[in-house]
Curated annotation (Swiss-Prot):
It comes from the Eukaryota. Residues 1-752, 786-806 are annotated as: Disordered. The modification Phosphoserine is found at residues 519, 762. This is Verprolin. InterPro entries: WH2_dom. Residues 1-15, 119-180, 236-245, 306-335, 372-382, 396-407, 423-432, 557-579, 649-661 have a biased composition (Pro residues). Residues 254-265, 713-737 have a biased composition (Polar residues). It is found in: Cytoplasm, Cytoskeleton. Glycans are attached at residues 109, 212, 337, 383, 784, 796. GO terms for biological process: actin cortical patch localization; bipolar cellular bud site selection; endocytosis; positive regulation of Arp2/3 complex-mediated actin nucleation; regulation of cytokinesis. Keywords: Cytoplasm, Cytoskeleton, Glycoprotein, Phosphoprotein, Repeat. Involved in cytoskeletal organization and cellular growth. May exert its effects on the cytoskeleton directly, or indirectly via proline-binding proteins (e.g. profilin) or proteins possessing SH3 domains. Belongs to the verprolin family.
């Protein structure tokens, strides 16, 4: 529209008018400009929206990406393309406004290649930093595809380490030669890098390593510039190799670089592109291959020792392999550094890579990046120490370590040990990047820290566990053990203070039911075991009239106390739990895992001492109560069980001296400690005694029911315990079948006792059937009560839908006749 009006303006003015046409031209031109700007603005807005996401995340890295695209386009596409990025990239990158649409135009001119670079970069995330090194590769080989492919290839590269080691080294080889080749042109490389960081991160580094990328991008130009004069042709490669061998390998690596530098440089562009294509094709394998990366990395490592000679023989291929190995190996060098074995640097690095499969994958993904990173960070780090180079090499690892930390640790425990020293050192150079290698250890430490906290709760292992847990290759087994221990702890509730006896017993009982370990602690707390061993008897006691039968089933030692102590036990029983509570807390803090009976015995001894102090006052009343109720209980106890051990407990109450019962209490727990098997029975009765005694103490009226229970016990003893359960729960056992066949329903008669709850004073809601149930229907007056007919009996017919088999409420129909 704008072009057309320019020629026609002269003719239209006469029609419009003499004066009007000129303003119309200016107006039209202005309108056209406005329209064009608006239309462009629409496109620009779209472009901005798409590109803003990346630059906002990437900052300085964005400039590097833009530079890379610009440089690539300059060499690969016509020179016309580079000026556009060159002019637009820095300005627009700085502005982050108008330049972004221009970048899109560049991508359109560059055809699909820049677009893949844009699309690929989001996947690599960390690749942007890698992309910066590929830029030197791009100058070496004029091909726009190279930068775009490395960005895309960066993700596949990790796949390749797992899938095939050679391609990875080859990919780094391309970066390696460019670095030496760029040695002479080193200043140019840094120049390209600043531009590259401006653009590429925008597309590639979204969120993973924006800070990391920015750091390498910023540091890369100065470091290579400074280091390049020092090392001249080989400086960039020299720094990366030093990390792998620490010191001894520096000369070795430099030599292969010398041999490799000239030939591979020529081959790199051609060789690098096919490898990139292969890597792109292999991207799909990434997910499946990563799991096996450790084994394949080992194969690469095995190949690595042979590779150094190869560079001398075949500079292009060995160089490709050799450089990648140092960049990939640099993470392992941490091991050689720790192990102080330069000879093993080639082979030793091999084992470390498995722990850093993610690191390897990241390095491979950023294989180009790996080489640039060492030049950027490696030169300063070697100046500082040999270990920092390892950090530099590990720098590519940072993104992967967080996901692989478990795998990394499992793969090599030694690396974790080495990584521990690395952890403190790397953090200083780059905050996020430094954490990369240490990050792998730190995440486990975080896990371990959380776990040590659990372990500290469990035992004194916390201090040692923080270091040892981090280093071992298998933190997972420790986690499982810790979790198991945690369960025991939480069940025991060592951290929490016990407020009431009932709750304590419940918590302890649950813990014992769940885990065996608490049992040693529980001996100190005698009551808890009853729930586990005699949980059914305990329920039966609550629901039935036979409190003493359960005591006899549990063991007789406490039963005398139960009979004697029915009123007093609540006071006496509580003290043991109180004493036991401090012991469990101490035990939980000191040693929850220790099953030694001696410690428990000591704790028990302590516990009895406290009960000893408390019980003496209650003991005399207990003896007085015992005089009343001892006879039936004793008879039952002696009849039911051999009272070799039981006789001893009764003897202390006979002594009647308060101190004696106090001593007898400790003696009983000690015996239970000495004999783990017999100990539970006494403990269980103590619980039953406590519960019964507490209920009795709360309701003195309920104390009489236990004595009648023996008679019921005698009647019930004839039946098997299972039958007793049913009868105690649902009936008194007196119900019998009067008719085998019901004449009314023509069906076999049913024992109502199986479906009716037997009433007792101890059961709420169901009372013993000695009273007639009266329904208060005073509000309802039936005038024809006398005239209401009785229902006729149902006879000589079969009920299709028979009604209930009985009543859930105990009914004694004799009371209503």
């Amino acid at each position: 529209m704008a072009g057309a009006p320019a020629p026609p303006p002269p003719p239209p003015p006469p029609a419009l008018g003499g004066s009007a046409p000129k303003p119309a031209k200016s107006v039209m031109q202005g309108r056209d400009a406005l329209l064009g700007d608006i239309r462009k603005g629409m496109k620009l807005k779209k472009a901005e929206t798409n590109d803003r996401s990346a630059p906002i995340v990437g900052g300085g890295v964005v400039s590097s990406a833009s530079g890379s695209s610009g440089t690539v386009s300059s060499k690969g596409p016509s020179m016309s393309a580079p000026p556009i990025p060159g002019m637009g990239a820095p300005q627009l990158g700085d502005i982050l406004a108008g330049g972004i649409p221009k970048l899109k135009h560049i991508n359109n001119n560059a055809s699909t290649k820049p677009s893949p670079s844009a699309s690929a970069p989001p996947i690599p995330g960390a690749v942007p930093s890698v992309a910066a090194p590929p830029i030197p590769n791009a100058p070496l080989s004029p091909a726009p595809a190279v930068p775009s492919i490395p960005s895309s290839s960066a993700p596949p590269i990790p796949d390749i380490p797992s899938s095939a080691a050679p391609p990875i080294p080859i990919v780094p080889s391309s970066p390696a030669p460019p670095l030496p080749l760029s040695g002479a042109s080193a200043p140019k490389v840094p120049q390209n890098r600043p531009h590259m960081p401006s653009v590429r991160p925008a597309h590639r580094s979204h969120q993973r390593k924006s800070s990391n990328i920015s750091l390498p991008s910023v540091s890369a130009p100065p470091l290579p510039s400074a280091s390049l004069p020092t090392h001249v042709s080989n400086p960039p490669q020299a720094p990366p190799p030093p990390p792998t061998p620490t010191i001894g390998l520096d000369s070795k690596n430099i030599k292969p670089t010398d041999n490799a530098v000239s030939p591979p440089s020529s081959e790199v562009p051609a060789g690098g592109l096919p490898f990139l294509a292969e890597i792109n094709a292999r991207r799909s394998e990434r997910g499946a291959v990563e799991g096996v990366s450790s084994t394949k990395i080992q194969t690469e490592n095995h190949k690595s020792p042979s590779q150094p000679p190869l560079p001398s023989s075949a500079p292009p291929i060995p160089t490709s392999h050799a450089p990648p190995l140092p960049p990939t190996a640099p993470p392992p060098p941490s091991l050689p550094n720790v192990t102080s074995a330069p000879k093993k640097a080639t082979s030793a690095p091999a084992p470390p890579p498995p722990p850093l499969p993610a690191a390897m994958s990241s390095a491979s993904t950023n294989s180009v990046k790996a080489t640039p990173v060492p030049p950027t960070l490696a030169p300063p780090l070697p100046n500082t120490t040999s270990v920092p180079p390892n950090k530099a090499s590990s720098m590519p690892a940072p993104p992967p370590p967080p996901p692989p930390p478990p795998g990394a640790f499992s793969t090599s425990s030694a690396l974790s040990a080495s990584s521990i020293p690395l952890a403190p050192l790397p953090p200083p150079p780059p905050p996020s990047v430094a954490t990369s290698v240490p990050s792998a250890p730190p995440p486990p430490p975080t896990l371990t820290t959380n776990k040590p906290s659990a372990s500290s709760k469990q035992s004194k292992i916390s201090s040692s566990s923080s270091s040892s847990a981090v280093t071992p290759g298998g933190p997972l087994p420790f986690l499982a053990e810790i979790q198991k221990k945690r369960d025991d702890r939480f069940v025991v509730g060592g951290d929490t203070g016990y407020t009431t006896q009932d709750k304590q017993e419940d918590v302890i009982g649950s813990s014992k039911d769940d885990n065996v370990r608490p049992s040693p602690i529980s001996p100190s707390i005698n009551p808890p075991k009853q729930s586990s061993q005699n949980g059914m008897s305990f329920l039966d006691e609550i629901e039935s009239k036979l409190h003493k039968q359960t005591s006899s089933n549990a063991f007789n030692a406490p039963p005398p106390h139960t009979d004697a102590m029915a009123p007093p036990l609540p006071p006496s029983a509580p003290p043991p739990p109180i004493t036991s509570l401090p012991t469990p807390t101490a035990s939980g803090d000191d040693h929850t895992n220790d099953k030694s009976e001696t410690v428990l015995g000591m704790k028990k001894a302590k516990a009895p001492a406290l009960p000893g102090h408390v019980p003496p006052p209650p003991v005399p009343p207990v003896l007085s109560d015992d005089s009343k109720n001892n006879v039936p209980a004793a008879s039952l106890l002696h009849d039911v069980l051999p009272s070799s051990n039981l006789e001893k407990p009764p003897s202390p109450p006979v002594a009647a001296a308060p101190p004696l019962p106090t001593f007898s209490a400790p003696s009983l727990p000690q015996q239970s400690v000495s004999t783990s098997i017999p100990s539970p029975p006494p403990v269980a009765p103590t619980l039953s005694v406590r519960t019964e005694t507490e209920s009795i103490s709360k309701n003195p009226t309920k104390s009489p029911p236990p004595p009648p229970s023996p008679s019921t016990m005698d009647t019930g003893t004839s039946n098997s315990p299972s039958k007793n359960l049913k009868q105690r729960l649902f009936s008194t056992g007196g119900s019998t079948l009067q008719h085998k066949h019901n004449t009314h329903t023509n069906q076999p008669d049913v024992d109502v006792g199986r479906y009716t709850i037997g009433g007792s004073n101890s059961i709420v809601g169901a009372k013993s059937g000695n009273e007639r149930i009266v329904i208060d229907d005073s509000r309802f007056k039936w005038t024809n009560v006398s005239q209401m007919p009785k229902p006729r009996p149902f006879q000589n017919k079969t009920k299709l839908y028979p009604s209930g088999k009985g009543s859930s409420v105990p009914l004694d129909l004799t009371l209503f006749t």
